[in-house]
């Protein structure tokens, strides 16, 4: 098999949604229909022994939410599917943003009762900015929901893209009878049953004009007929080019927990979602079928196996072929990386990997050698772009009750900081570490993980700072003068990038006015490369 052939078989996509829209359930069912698992864990059935395959962290199992991004690979219809299940909770949008830089398409899950919610909209804006193709699944049609025409209108207005229904619901809630497949001109009949976890055949009706069918489904079928006639006349034809440019989104209706509508989504992902495309590096554009390997670290996860205190760097392969044992270099440091124990994933479960290709997500055991946004190559000097770090919006101080555990605290914070789910700042003056995050839940997760994974009872308390900006200058001398003059407000992040801390936005404005030679940044990229100044 050639590299080009293998690349064309790849489909790499993320599932995004607002919390509780059914994203993790849909992930489970996609794995079920692809044959990757045989029983789907129910996200709500927390009292049972089953947990969702993609919710593996202890706190996720307790609370029933996804707070870490999971990666799963499976084969279906001669395609290799890399599926990334992202955190649904809004506090973890930074991790989700980085995951979205590693995919070629997105599957958006919408709760049919709530429509497009705030978190969904933020993530979709990221997809739109990157022109990522989006397939939409409107979930929970077996419950009382909004009118489908209203949902379609809202999706179109808020996303600013054409909505192309591929299926249309016949009824909803207790009167949900199924969906009409507009492409294949047939109706798929819904059968309820939340306990069904095995794949089942869906009953299909091809002749909707049969009087017996009209009598069976009554007014719901007639209403669906009228709505289908309306949308068929109003919606444009599906256009693959427009879809790939992020200008059209195919829409499916269904009920993930009942396995209904999942098969059609999976088939469409294989048929319409793009294979891996080119990737931008500072030096040039990288094509996926190039012979030489290149990849970028978009996520680091500590303690996937708490017994081994391991750290895995998740790498999106951007070009070429990975072969077990090959020599790879970290462009930032020039250091070699061992590749004899590289793995592929089914969530927490891992398998040693022999080969992989552009589009695949591989896991490299990491003991501090790799950082977020690191580029790996066979020797070429490349740096991929577009993996951001955001200035925290909430700060907390951290202390421990037992000073003898301070070494474990520093180790735990260093490793959790490497993941990017929390940012750890070391003050220029003093020794008390600062934790920075974009949401409150992140601190809860960190204290929980410090206790259960590192044996550290940590206390966190609000810090006096509320804002942070990374600072740069034209010359090292100018930057050092600024640091010396503001020493009590300076801290350093995980890559020693200097940061100016403030309690109020006015303090940043005053500093900008007094120091015209200093630039203040809301975001930074790899190893301190800055972009987007404060605004």
UniProtKB/Swiss-Prot annotation:
UniProt record similarity statement: Belongs to the TRAFAC class translation factor GTPase superfamily. Classic translation factor GTPase family. PrfC subfamily.
UniProt organism field: Nitrosomonas europaea (strain ATCC 19718 / CIP 103999 / KCTC 2705 / NBRC 14298)
Function recorded in the entry: Increases the formation of ribosomal termination complexes and stimulates activities of RF-1 and RF-2. It binds guanine nucleotides and has strong preference for UGA stop codons. It may interact directly with the ribosome. The stimulation of RF-1 and RF-2 is significantly reduced by GTP and GDP, but not by GMP.
Subcellular localization, as worded in the UniProt entry: Cytoplasm
Gene Ontology BP term (one): regulation of translational termination
Protein name: Peptide chain release factor 3
GO cellular component: cytosol
Amino acids binding GTP: 17-24, 85-89, 139-142
PANTHER family: PEPTIDE CHAIN RELEASE FACTOR RF3 (PTHR43556:SF2)
NCBIfam families per UniProt: prfC, PRK00741.1, small_GTP
